[in-house]
Regions:
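Transmembrane helical segments that form the transport core of multi-pass membrane transport proteins
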Residues: 340-397
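Membrane-interfacial helix-loop-helix connectors in multipass membrane proteins
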Residues: 149-174, 236-247, 351-358, 409-422, ...
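Hydrophobic alpha-helical membrane segments
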Residues: 1-340
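Transmembrane alpha-helical segments in integral membrane proteins
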Residues: 85-108, 183-186, 380-404, 435, ...
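Membrane-interfacial helix-loop connectors
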Residues: 75, 79, 375-430
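Final/C-terminal transmembrane alpha-helix of multipass membrane proteins
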Residues: 328-332, 467-491
Length: 498
């Protein structure tokens, strides 16, 4: 469910990527991009950026670079970028609402012993407008809370003292508005799910909740503060250990789900999941007989984890064999964008120098780099896969973006050095990305079918579960690829380059 939410929110970056890509296309169409890159490369070379000579005041920007920058900042380019930012903000509000609908409906279903994935899908279809409305209201509260501080800051032009005082008052007033508003809306989403009411009724129930059940409300606030404190502490610990990317897994996939299930359970007055077959629990002799089965020991946690990843590898192979066209479509988009990236940067004359000590590029024992690579690549794969829920647009964008980056780097790097630094792990990592993109297109077909009536929520839920199974298999592949990239690729590249 939370990976589904990640897929929905992945749509936010689509307009930004399109805006940047469109701007680069405009600049490349009339040679302005080539001039800008050439001037900046010359400026960087003269300033000896790699040597750190700009640590002090630094050299002045040469007239050629200043002119190239001025030529690049035109109304169409600025319009594209501003439009991309505005579109991203709007999509962010909508995507957050849809993500909340999916996760809270899924949690409520899990508490009732129903299928959480199917409930998430049907819940989004039923209550999307209420959750998007709540998301818009939350964003409006933040904007409203910022207004007093902005008005206070505007007085700095008249008097610094008055501006400082007014800004401080504005921050307190605006912060109070935001806090009170968010507290009032705390259980609105849970009310939509549990009470099956609209946005108006949900807001009313959420406002009444602290009055009717003050102990539960205060308890939830304390739990929330504890979860965010734990997340902050974990982030600090991960940063000290050099594996800050783990926060991207622990937060969205462990702590936030815990907070959501506490919220829904409190509101629904349930404390633990109730199995679907509780109503049919045997009694008497039948119960005694069933106890014999129940006493069969379950496999240990480690065995279950190993079995899950082994099953993921089986699912990975089955998906590639069963849906090769989806994987090939992802690979084709990647290759198309890579070719465009080479064309875009190959004629600029710029060149990225290789590291002087290739074999030490990640350090002697790059455990932190290894963890970073595994987490980052798996999250990229999960986003591409579950981005298919938005009709595959984020999945296609991810394939195009990754291909463009690889092609653009190839166009400005020494080809032999680039291949030596990419090929050893790329033979595993790139196919894994293609499979993730193929998963996204596979889910997109199901999502499109649901919208047109050709696919049921149950079938789409099965595709989402299959994607999770395949992602576990991809995790194994990406761990091996990261081991090669962190520990072997630098040494292989050093041997190739001499």
């Amino acid at each position: 469910m939370y990976l589904l939410g990640i897929g929905l929110t992945a749509t936010v970056r689509v307009p930004l990527i399109l805006a940047v890509g469109g701007s680069l296309g405009l600049l490349a169409s009339d040679g302005r991009l080539e001039t800008l890159v050439s001037e900046f490369t010359q400026f960087a070379r003269e300033a000896d950026l790699d040597g750190g000579s700009m640590a002090g005041s630094g050299p002045e920007i040469p007239p050629g670079l200043e002119t190239a920058l001025g030529d690049a900042i035109t109304l169409p380019v600025v319009g594209l970028l501003v439009g991309g930012v505005v579109a991203a903000l709007v999509i962010s509000v909508v995507a957050n609402g849809l993500s909340s609908a999916a996760t809270l409906h899924g949690m409520h279903a899990a508490l009732r012993g129903d299928d959480p994935v199917r409930a998430a899908i049907t819940g989004v279809g039923r209550d999307w407008s209420s959750f998007v409305g709540l998301s818009v209201l939350t964003a409006g509260l933040v904007v409203l809370g910022a207004l007093p501080a902005l008005l206070g800051a505007s007085l700095f032009a008249i008097s610094p003292a008055a501006g400082g005082l007014a800004t401080a008052v504005g921050v307190v007033l605006g912060g109070g508005i935001v806090i009170v508003g968010l507290l009032a809306l705390t259980f609105a989403g849970a009310s939509v799910v549990v009470d099956t009411v609209g946005i108006g009724g949900a807001i009313g129930e959420s406002i009444r909740f602290p009055v009717d059940r003050p102990v539960a409300f205060v308890g939830y606030i304390l739990v929330s503060l504890g979860v965010f404190g734990l997340l902050s502490a974990a982030g600090s610990l991960f940063s000290v250990l050099g594996v800050s990317q783990l926060s991207g897994l622990v937060g969205p996939l462990l702590l936030v789900p815990f907070l959501d299930i506490v919220q829904v359970a409190l509101y629904a007055e349930q404390s633990a999941p109730r199995r679907r077959d509780d109503a049919n629990t045997p009694t008497g002799a039948a119960a005694a007989e069933s106890d014999i089965v129940a006493d069969v020991p379950r496999p240990g946690a480690l065995r279950r984890i190993v079995a899950a990843f082994r099953d993921g590898l089986v699912g990975l192979g089955g998906f590639v064999r069963g849906y090769p066209l989806a994987v090939l479509a992802a690979a084709g988009l990647f290759a198309l964008a890579a070719g465009g990236g080479v064309v875009l940067t190959g004629g600029t004359g710029a060149e990225i120098p290789l590291p002087t000590e290739v074999n030490e590029v990640f350090g002697a024992v790059p455990v932190d780099v290894f963890v970073m690579l595994v987490v980052n690549n798996w999250l990229v794969s999960a986003t591409a896969a579950y981005g298919g829920i938005a009709i595959g647009i984020p999945a296609a964008t991810d394939m195009l973006l990754n291909g463009l980056i690889v092609g653009a780097l190839y166009g400005v790097a020494d080809q032999t050095g680039f291949l030596a630094l990419v090929a050893p792990h790329g033979v595993l990592e790139l196919p894994a990305i293609f499979v993730a993109g193929g998963l996204g297109f596979h889910i997109a077909a199901g999502a499109g079918g649901l919208l047109t009536g050709r696919c049921s929520a149950r079938l789409l839920a099965n595709r989402l579960r299959r994607a999770y199974r395949v992602l576990l298999g991809l995790a194994v592949v990406l761990v091996v690829a990261a081991l090669i990239e962190a520990f072997l690729t630098p040494r292989i590249a050093a041997a190739v380059l001499g």
